[in-house]
Amino acid sequence: MDKLLVLTQLADLLNRQKLRWAVGGSLMLYLRGVVSDFEDIDLFVTLEDAQQVIELLDQVAIPQETVPSEQFQTVVYKKYLMDGVFIDVMAGLRLL
């Protein structure tokens, strides 16, 4: 499926629930015209909304295995596959 269509579906899902979110990574650069394509959807949510976002994505996407990183100590990090597009969900981003 088209990556932008997945983003649109994801945005609609989150906005209907009035959840706070933003995109980052290569998608943000793509939307700003800096790069010509993006790999996945890096989704940043608030710690307060993280559990609800996870519950929503558990219903519409396939959870993927995540590998912990010593460099990033993000409080919430989940990975999903939705219609062929990978989505990384992050809340409480921490860099060491």
What annotation goes with each model-predicted range?
Residues 1-22, 49:
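Helical scaffold of the NTase/Pol beta-like nucleotidyltransferase catalytic core
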Residues 20-32:
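Short helix-loop-helix/strand-helix junction enriched in hydrophobic and basic residues
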Residues 27, 49, 93-95:
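Short, flexible active-site-adjacent loop segments at beta-strand->alpha-helix junctions, enriched
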Residues 7-11, 54, 77:
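Short amphipathic alpha-helical segments and helix-helix/interface helices
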Residues 31-53:
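Catalytic metal-binding acidic patch
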Residues 61-96:
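Conserved catalytic core of two-metal-ion nucleotidyltransferases
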Residues 53-60:
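Short amphipathic alpha-helices in soluble, non-transmembrane regions
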